[in-house]
Amino acid sequence: MNFFEDLTLVYNKAIKKTLKNIKNNPVILLGPIFYGALYQIAINIFSIFIAPLLGVLSGFLLPIVSSMILSSYFSMLSDVIYYNRISFNNFTRSFTDYFSSIYSVYFILIIISWITPMLGNLPVAHLFISVILVVLFNPIAEEIYIGGNTYTQAYSKCVEFFKENAFLWMLPFILYLLITQVMGFSIANGLMFSNVIDIPLGNFQMSPLMGTSNIKAIIALLLTGVYAIFRGNLFTILNNSTRRKRAYMGEYYDDWRKTRKRN
């Protein structure tokens, strides 16, 4: 099986699973809207009332809030990807399901954010490093809620995943960025390393006032919901797999199907 056959096989399987997930759980598309609004409200409250009192310590405490919100969203995505259903019975507990894993990854992001200013006032260098890190660690959210990895292991597993699946993984991400760029959103937001763990959530803020900007943001967030589910399904297909292994399994399945037809 050549590269393009593998690409077609993988994407077709991921798309079919994604459509099935959405058909059975359409509410999942509202995830980025609900959690994005919750995220925005929490950050505004923190920035206005708490950050001025804590100063530099707020850099460690704000990720606590972010980690809890992402934990709940990742828990919902996990239910859909693994079981093709959403359960709200343990909704309150979902805010802690992946909390420690997410915060451990955020901690490293904080350390990196302290190191990068040492490069001085070099915007091009900062952007270049940010893009490289976003590419290498792009699937870190999936490494957490699907791969079950945490702290430095989550980052190292991302690099391993990238070595084997760089093109298959990054092509949908680039397409997603281009679509949002056409919609009027800056592609730079998706290339900021500080937002790498938030990719399945999107980074499109809504205004309290209704307007065309809010309509575009809602459409972008719905698109993000579709993309987040697709990412999860794509990750489950590619993780711990190789093109050779997929070729063997695909050929085995084709032979089995032909045998069944003859019988």
Model regions and ranges:
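Hydrophobic alpha-helical membrane segments
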Residues: M1-N263
